């Protein structure tokens, strides 16, 4: 049976004592996190710290073994209907674009609204054009992914997620696979999205983006949340030695 639960202070996302293992490896250790509507969170930390696993658990791409995850009042549990409902409200952009190479940019963006939300084709196309314009790439709507740059493909991936009208956007190192000259165009798109009031969680090493956009920066290491604070406090006065060591490596 579908279950709708109250969350702390009308939170959009709540993780309570979340644990996950890969075999014997304890990848997430008692993660507690509350995200309010419209809040913009940046997760940072060294490779293998559990950042990506944390956000992938939020839309059940990874399954947690202990604890509770509640998204927009819906608990993620074994009920497949709950998982499907959450996924309709959560967009995700990955390191790699995962666009269908045999479909045009426009078709990539209309596929999910037509098949999942049962949207009429014309309405889905109008919506796709709207979001392609928003990410400044509408002129490429009828091209195939292989005909545009990596940065442009990542902006298409963002538009594709927005076409499902999500309440939450998750970004898993969206610029890490891009050439340096393409990073800015994707970050600018994400900054515009953040300014629109979208609830966002972003795993990234782009500390300039974190300073500009985040309401809160969370540092993870060895499967734990080590430290979290507003950007000014986080970067100026990190409390943990582990945080200071990490920042010394990524800020030049």
From Swiss-Prot:
InterPro entries found in the cross-reference section: AAA+_ATPase, ABC_ATPase_HisP-typ, ABC_transporter-like_ATP-bd, ABC_transporter-like_CS, MetN_ABC_transporter-like, P-loop_NTPase
Domain ABC transporter: 13-247
Function statement: Probably part of a binding-protein-dependent transport system YdhWXYZ for an amino acid. Probably responsible for energy coupling to the transport system.
Keyword Transport: yes
Similarity comment: family membership: Belongs to the ABC transporter superfamily.
Mode of membrane association: Peripheral membrane protein
PROSITE patterns reported in the protein's UniProt record: ABC_TRANSPORTER_1, ABC_TRANSPORTER_2
Annotated keywords: Amino-acid transport, ATP-binding, Cell inner membrane, Cell membrane, Membrane, Nucleotide-binding, Transport
Database matches in Gene3D superfamilies: P-loop containing nucleotide triphosphate hydrolases
Top-rank lineage group of the source organism: Bacteria
Cellular component terms per the entry's GO annotation: ATP-binding cassette (ABC) transporter complex; ATP-binding cassette (ABC) transporter complex, substrate-binding subunit-containing; membrane
Chain positions recorded as ATP binding sites: 45-52
Protein name per the record: Uncharacterized amino-acid ABC transporter ATP-binding protein YhdZ
Any one of the GO BP annotations: peptide transport
Pfam families given in the database record: ABC_tran
An example Gene Ontology molecular-function term: ATP hydrolysis activity
SMART domains registered for this protein in UniProt: AAA
Subcellular location: Cell inner membrane
SUPFAM superfamilies attached to this UniProt entry: P-loop containing nucleoside triphosphate hydrolases
Main location: membrane
């Amino acid at each position: 049976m579908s279950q709708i639960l109250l969350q702390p202070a009308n939170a959009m996302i709540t993780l309570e004592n979340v644990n996950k293992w890969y075999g014997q490896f304890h990848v997430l250790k008692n993660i507690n996190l509350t995200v309010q509507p419209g809040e913009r969170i940046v997760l940072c930390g060294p490779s293998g710290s559990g950042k990506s696993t944390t956000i992938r658990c939020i839309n059940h791409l990874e399954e947690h073994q202990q604890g509770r995850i509640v998204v927009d009042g819906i608990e993620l549990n074994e009920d497949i209907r709950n998982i499907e409902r959450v996924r309709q409200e959560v967009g995700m952009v990955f390191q790699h674009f995962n666009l269908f190479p045999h479909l045009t940019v426009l078709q990539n963006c209309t596929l999910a609204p037509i098949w999942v939300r049962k949207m009429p084709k014309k309405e889905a196309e109008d919506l796709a054009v709207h979001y392609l314009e928003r990410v400044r790439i509408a002129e490429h709507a009828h091209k195939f992914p292989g005909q545009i740059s990596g940065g442009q493909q990542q902006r298409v991936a963002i538009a594709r997620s927005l076409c499902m009208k999500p309440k939450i956007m998750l970004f898993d190192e969206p610029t890490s696979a891009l050439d340096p000259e393409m990073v800015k165009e994707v970050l600018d798109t994400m900054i515009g999205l953040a300014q629109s009031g979208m609830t966002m969680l972003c795993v990234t090493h782009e500390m300039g983006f974190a300073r500009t956009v985040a309401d809160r920066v969370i540092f993870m290491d060895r499967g734990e949340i080590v430290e979290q604070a507003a950007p000014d406090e986080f970067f100026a006065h990190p409390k943990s030695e582990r945080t200071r060591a990490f920042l010394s490596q990524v800020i030049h």
